[in-house]
């Protein structure tokens, strides 16, 4: 199948609207991607004609809803090439998935004197849960430092591991810098030291194929809303042997086998024992439609198109005076920048006046901001529906802001 950005754009209703009297140029998909009609329609159709509570229902609607939900689990397992659909847990998003691992596996396996390794480029969602776990149990949090070009100082990684290292928690792709970390060698090194590996894939799965078996990671987590799906739904992958050993971290309906006031409670098997309560079934249906949509476009096609667009954007941005770019030349998805000494909020506000949507702030990466000694950055992100013309508008807008503000 040949990739056509025009055909893709026609599937996203919001891209036809105007902002401040100008066509919308949506360059904020790394925060949350827009949704194609196929996703919107699938979720709406479920609520209109197929909604029911899943699991244990004997009536037709419940049985059909349960089947649809479990089919999405199967589709998601194929999407990341898991060995089994039963290695996947539905979560609210990447943040909940990481917290689940920290509170279930972490509480059972990390002890006083142990250590966990993260990096200086992590999103807060892959920092704070580990800080909280370390504080609870008396463990140490170790950090892989950054190079100025936005890559990790990988030569320091072997010195951070020891016999007390229990986990390496690392982002696949930086949400600020676009750096794609060399996971294969990092995971191999971690396993050589007996440590498990969690990968934050929130900024990776929409840009190119991900194969969790080839990576050999122990945990992989991503969100639906950055993958053109609904909010409030995501996937946590855990190797089956690990998942079966992990205790539940939330209690309630659906995650039990038996409940007795005198004899206590026994759990159902994984992954369902990690899905307490009524699930976000509509969101799951929408996620399934998003996975189907992205797969139909072809992730390799998407990767090729987006990389060409990224190369074009980086080359065109060289024409903007006083523009500071952050991150390596080879990157995925995002371009973080500042214009002169102007605050990112001011630059972002001007761009919004021109109909261009970018993200401004610390991007849930305060340690990274501290490393670059800036309070905030602007971030333009590129998705499969963005165009060369939108990149040109961004460049022209920044040039205009520079002329206005100096």
Swiss-Prot record:
Catalytic activity annotation: (sulfur carrier)-H + L-cysteine = (sulfur carrier)-SH + L-alanine; L-selenocysteine + AH2 = hydrogenselenide + L-alanine + A + H(+)
SUPFAM superfamilies, alphabetized: PLP-dependent transferases (SSF53383)
Pathway membership: Cofactor biosynthesis; iron-sulfur cluster biosynthesis
Record's keyword terms, sorted: Cytoplasm, Lyase, Pyridoxal phosphate, Transferase
KW Transferase (keyword) present: yes
Cofactor(s) this protein requires: pyridoxal 5'-phosphate
Active site per database record: 364 (cysteine persulfide intermediate)
N6-(pyridoxal phosphate)lysine modified-residue sites: 226
Intracellular or extracellular location(s): Cytoplasm
Molecular functions per Gene Ontology: cysteine desulfurase activity; pyridoxal phosphate binding; selenocysteine lyase activity
Top-level taxon in the UniProt lineage: Bacteria
Gene Ontology BP terms: cysteine metabolic process
Enzyme Commission (EC) number: 2.8.1.7, 4.4.1.16
Main location: cytoplasm
Family according to the record: Belongs to the class-V pyridoxal-phosphate-dependent aminotransferase family. Csd subfamily.
Subunit structure: Homodimer. Interacts with SufE and the SufBCD complex composed of SufB, SufC and SufD. The interaction with SufE is required to mediate the direct transfer of the sulfur atom from the S-sulfanylcysteine.
Main function: Cysteine desulfurases mobilize the sulfur from L-cysteine to yield L-alanine, an essential step in sulfur metabolism for biosynthesis of a variety of sulfur-containing biomolecules. Component of the suf operon, which is activated and required under specific conditions such as oxidative stress and iron limitation. Acts as a potent selenocysteine lyase in vitro, that mobilizes selenium from L-selenocysteine. Selenocysteine lyase activity is however unsure in vivo.
Protein name per its UniProtKB record: Cysteine desulfurase
């Amino acid at each position: 199948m040949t990739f056509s950005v025009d055909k893709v754009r026609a599937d996203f209703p919001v891209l036809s609207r105007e902002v401040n009297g100008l066509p919308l140029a949506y360059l904020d998909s790394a925060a949350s991607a827009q949704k194609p009609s196929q996703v919107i329609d699938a979720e709406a159709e479920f609520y209109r004609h197929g909604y029911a509570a899943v699991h244990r229902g004997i009536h037709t609607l419940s049985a059909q809803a349960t089947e649809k939900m479990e089919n999405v689990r199967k589709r998601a397992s194929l999407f990341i090439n898991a060995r089994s659909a039963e290695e996947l847990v539905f979560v609210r998003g990447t943040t909940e998935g990481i917290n689940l691992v920290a509170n279930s596996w972490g509480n059972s396996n990390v002890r006083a004197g142990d250590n966990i390794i993260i990096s200086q480029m992590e999103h807060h969602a892959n920092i704070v849960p580990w800080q909280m776990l370390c504080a609870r149990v008396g463990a140490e949090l170790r950090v892989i430092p950054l190079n100025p070009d936005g890559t990790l100082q990988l030569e320091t990684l072997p010195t951070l591991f020891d016999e007390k290292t229990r986990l390496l928690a690392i982002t696949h792709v930086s949400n600020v810098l676009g750096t794609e970390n060399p996971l294969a060698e990092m995971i191999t090194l971690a396993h050589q030291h007996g440590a498990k590996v969690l990968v934050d894939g929130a900024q990776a799965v929409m840009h190119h194929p991900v194969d969790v078996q080839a990576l050999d990671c122990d945990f992989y987590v991503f969100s639906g809303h950055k993958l053109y799906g609904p909010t409030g739904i995501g996937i946590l992958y855990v190797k089956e042997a690990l998942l079966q050993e992990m205790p539940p971290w939330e209690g309630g309906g659906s995650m039990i086998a038996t409940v007795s006031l005198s004899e206590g409670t026994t759990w159902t098997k994984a992954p369902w024992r990690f899905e307490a309560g009524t699930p976000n079934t509509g969101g799951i249906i929408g996620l399934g439609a998003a996975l189907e949509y992205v797969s139909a476009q072809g992730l390799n096609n998407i990767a090729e198109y987006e990389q060409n667009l990224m190369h074009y954007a980086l080359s065109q941005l060289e024409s903007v005076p006083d523009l500071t770019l952050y991150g390596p030349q080879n990157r995925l998805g995002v371009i973080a920048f500042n214009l002169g000494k102007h605050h990112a909020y001011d630059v972002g506000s001007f761009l919004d006046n021109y109909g261009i949507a970018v993200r401004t702030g610390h991007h849930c990466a305060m340690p990274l901001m501290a490393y670059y000694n800036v309070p905030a950055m602007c971030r333009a992100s590129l998705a499969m529906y963005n165009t060369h013309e939108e990149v040109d508008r961004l460049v022209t807008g920044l040039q205009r802001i520079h002329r206005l503000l100096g």
